[in-house]
């Protein structure tokens, strides 16, 4: 059982191999995947969200590992898609598969899974960006108190190819 990725790699997403995980596939897929399961009034991609998270980590002066992990934190969605949080919470097997894939991505590009403190920073940034996405697009405040966000992400629809290239360029800068 396999999927065929953008770069024509055939991989089993239930048992990912390091050599099958390619940044080009993640960048391409995320540039085409919408946030909020398509319920925002305009298209805002997972790729744009990931770039915004990485830029926020840079603005907070976090380590290059945390910045790269922020860029990659939704990488599993390139291979598995995503499920909304309320539903995902009920799907323990999916969460296990997603964690396995995400851990494989971290190992592939970071050399290891982020430490607990690093994961805490990644999660904080992810949730802050999510909060401001929903505030901007839906007028909905997901938390009682607005979380810290140092940057000011541009919430706009961008050409897919531009997002893909920006993702790849940022990755290249972070892995020099």
List the predicted regions and their residue ranges.
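Metal-dependent phosphohydrolase cores
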Residues: 1-176
